Amino acid sequence: MGSKALFYFGNAAVDQVRNTGWFVGQFVPAEQDLRHQTDVELKWGVHKDGEQRSHPWANGNATTISVLIQGALHVTFDVGGTPQVVTLRTEGDYVIFGPGAVHSWEAVGDTIVLSVRFPSVEVERPRMSSGG
């Protein structure tokens, strides 16, 4: 029987699962030890200028915190049928939203966002599209 690792050193962009940006969570194979988690998931989102999720979507199971590392990000929430836009424009700006928050987003300039989602529950995520 093997022993569980005490630590892991890696790179978020390299360690992402299925080219999604997500690198910690229940979707990481269990043999990856510490990166396989059911309480939290992490995403290193690298987005080109104009890249977007144009179709509003909600994760019905988890709370999400997205922290801007570089660039800018428009996040649009559907609040009772009315769009409400939040713009992350300064490094360290963040938005937190709960389960069921319908949202879409668009990168303004080349953008990097670290997203933390909890708990880590498998859901079908929409594909992103390039702006044009």
Regions from the PLM with identified roles:
Residues 48-52, 91-92, 98-100, 110:
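Tight coil/turn sites that cap or link beta-strands
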Residues 54-56, 75-76, 97, 102-108, ...:
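Short beta-strand His + acidic residue motifs that chelate non-heme Fe in jelly-roll/DSBH
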Residues 37-39, 60, 108:
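A generic fold-level signal
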Residues 79-99:
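Short acidic-glycine-tyrosine-enriched beta hairpin
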Residues 3, 7, 104-132:
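Double-stranded beta-helix
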Residues 59-75:
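Short, conserved beta-strand element in jelly-roll/cupin
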Residues 1-49, 54-55, 86-87, 132:
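A short, N-terminal "cap"/entry segment at the start of jelly-roll beta-barrel domains
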